[in-house]
Amino acid sequence: MKKLTGILTATIAAAALFLGANTVANADTTITVGASAAPHAEILRHVQPQLKKEGINLKIKVFDDYIMPNKALANGEIDANYFQHIPFLKDWNKKNHGTLVDAGDIHLEPIGVYSKKYKSLKKLPKNAKVYVSSNVSDYGRVLKLFKDAGLITLKKGTKLETATFNDIKTNKKNITFKHTFEAKLMPKLYESNEADATVINSNYAVQAGLKPTKDAIALEKKSSPYANLIAVQKGDQKRPAIKKLVKVLKSKSTQKWINNKYNGAVLPVGSQK
């Protein structure tokens, strides 16, 4: 009887250990990633089957703005997000005392200038009005486009990652940059034709049916440091599921798919086999 009791006890203990281990495994193999609708969620949907083969059940939660994804990540509502670039993440952490980190850089979305009135930045008239989103971390990108076109110069020592419109030294056409709009509204403002030119992030341009490489009158170069990334809470970048997610997103096959689908509007960053 004692022997039978011992066997039963051992069996129950082994089963408990198995169930406990299985629960931990399941917790790490199902991840929820918050993302912008395009191209981020589209890219994630593309890699879902591959991740399934890797034992990862990927759930995607789509956000339509740049505010909620980091709040949801910080609150533990999602495991990671995919919508922002490095300067935006740094700025958010600074303003919100956050500890979110970059788990891997995936792609670049060149920011572009669009106009229904003019074919190039150099054709903009004196006293032109340009609409820009209120994302402070993108101001340097906008300024560089206008600087490269010879329309403005910047004060000595200006760093693009922290630049604002107050850093403009000379503005030979007296261009007014109105930067009070939510990023997601920029395509509608472009369609309204209110301004002489409108600056739009490529994800919102693509969502609106625009083709950045064809429709933009000025487009950020591939060498831009503003790579879109997978963000996680500090420490989670070491989770096996997150590592697998980043590896699949940076694989050559995924990046080939990105190049073919977006035709230069979205540019892969680096690659892994």
Show which residues each predicted segment covers.
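A conserved helix-loop-strand patch within extracytoplasmic ligand-binding domains
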Residues: 103-152, 255
